[in-house]
Amino acid sequence: MDLVVEPNLHSLINSSTHKWIFVGGKGGVGKTTSSCSIAIQMAQSQPHKQFLLISTDPAHNLSDAFGEKFGKDARRVTGMNNLSCMEIDPSAALKDMNDMAVSQANENGAQGDDGLGGLLQGGALAELTGSIPGIDEALSFMEVMKHIKNQEKGEGERYDTVIFDTAPTGHTLRFLQLPNTLSKLLEKFGEITGRLGPMLNSLAGAGNVDISTKLNQLKESVETIKDQFTNPDLTTFVCVCISEFLSLYETERLIQELISYDMDVNSIIVNQLLFADDDQEHNCKRCQARWKMQKKYLDQIDELYEDFHVVKMPLCAGEIRGLENLRKFSRFLNKEYNPAMDNKIIYELENKK
């Protein structure tokens, strides 16, 4: 008997094991709306758990989606007691990192204008690293490491599941490559510090700090993340696309890359569907023409990903902004949209100011 895969995310929304959920795809396909919707549905379905939604996209949209301001520190969504949001700000994170480096350098005996502390006082670290390609992804990765450390120590708010609203595909792939890249880099650093450790400690003004120990601790943290990201019970990736050629092509490329990283991926959200055959009241030649094109690519998606959860989401008449609109829209992730029965809901969003 053939395995029937449900066209919804019900199993993920009610999952008791997942710690990390990534939501990504091509730019402009509705990633933020989808990640917010997943987070809301999980929070509603599991009220005894705490959820965190993090934006790793430099063009942060979580504040716009919910209609309230979020920043670099996690803050509860108004109207929900078990869902928090945060937007990683690279410039603020770099400043914090620079200030921390100054403090540590001064504590370890590198005071003075000629020491490491003096070099960093003017924001040299932030200035140097701010222009490095991929710094946004690296800072996002550091945030993941911080959450793992805090949970291991029992510090701060404990989140059962973290949902990532990721940047467009290229940024996301660089982010997911970081565990492997850092692991290899730290191995090389380990070899160097094994030979030059005392000299490096002296240069850093950190005679009482064993650099090799610090590197080994960092390597252990990176390996922990690698293990968790490749465990399908703990981590999964939800692809988001629209039913057009370029989006379908990029989704396939993304899926192949994720498979090469040994990451679990078995869900696709297809957004902005017209379902024109079932909407005779609001129909036109242009709608029919676009729906015909969408159906062509939907058939290809169904054929290519027959063993995936393919969730088909409607194009709404208005913007999906604010908690109430997101709640209405997100219900179709848990129980698939029925054009004949649910048609009215997509027009209810039209009147939201």
Curated annotation (Swiss-Prot):
Show the HAMAP family listed in the entry.
Asna1_Get3 (MF_03112)
Query: Is the Chloroplast keyword given for this protein?
Result: no
Please name the catalytic residues of this protein: D57
Any GO molecular function: metal ion binding
List the subcellular locations. Cytoplasm; Endoplasmic reticulum; Golgi apparatus
- SUPFAM superfamilies named among the record's database cross-references: P-loop containing nucleoside triphosphate hydrolases
GO biological process terms, alphabetically, are: tail-anchored membrane protein insertion into ER membrane
* Keyword Zinc (UniProt): yes
General function of this protein: ATPase required for the post-translational delivery of tail-anchored (TA) proteins to the endoplasmic reticulum. Recognizes and selectively binds the transmembrane domain of TA proteins in the cytosol. This complex then targets to the endoplasmic reticulum by membrane-bound receptors GET1 and GET2, where the tail-anchored protein is released for insertion. This process is regulated by ATP binding and hydrolysis. ATP binding drives the homodimer towards the closed dimer state, facilitating recognition of newly synthesized TA membrane proteins. ATP hydrolysis is required for insertion.
- Which cellular components does GO assign to this protein? GET complex; Golgi apparatus
Enzyme Commission designation? 3.6.-.-
* UniProt family annotation: Belongs to the arsA ATPase family.
What does the subunit section of this Swiss-Prot or TrEMBL entry state? Homodimer. Component of the Golgi to ER traffic (GET) complex, which is composed of GET1, GET2 and GET3. Within the complex, GET1 and GET2 form a heterotetramer which is stabilized by phosphatidylinositol binding and which binds to the GET3 homodimer. Interacts with the chloride channel protein GEF1.
Amino acids binding Zn(2+)? C284, C287
Binding of ATP, residues: K26, G27, G28, V29, G30, K31, T32, T33, E244, N271
- Source superkingdom: Eukaryota
Per the UniProt record, the source organism is Zygosaccharomyces rouxii (strain ATCC 2623 / CBS 732 / NBRC 1130 / NCYC 568 / NRRL Y-229)
- Read off the InterPro entries from this record: Anion-transp_ATPase-like_dom, ATPase_ArsA/GET3, ATPase_ArsA/GET3_euk, P-loop_NTPase
- Fetch the Pfam families from UniProt: ArsA_ATPase
Q: What is this protein called?
A: ATPase GET3
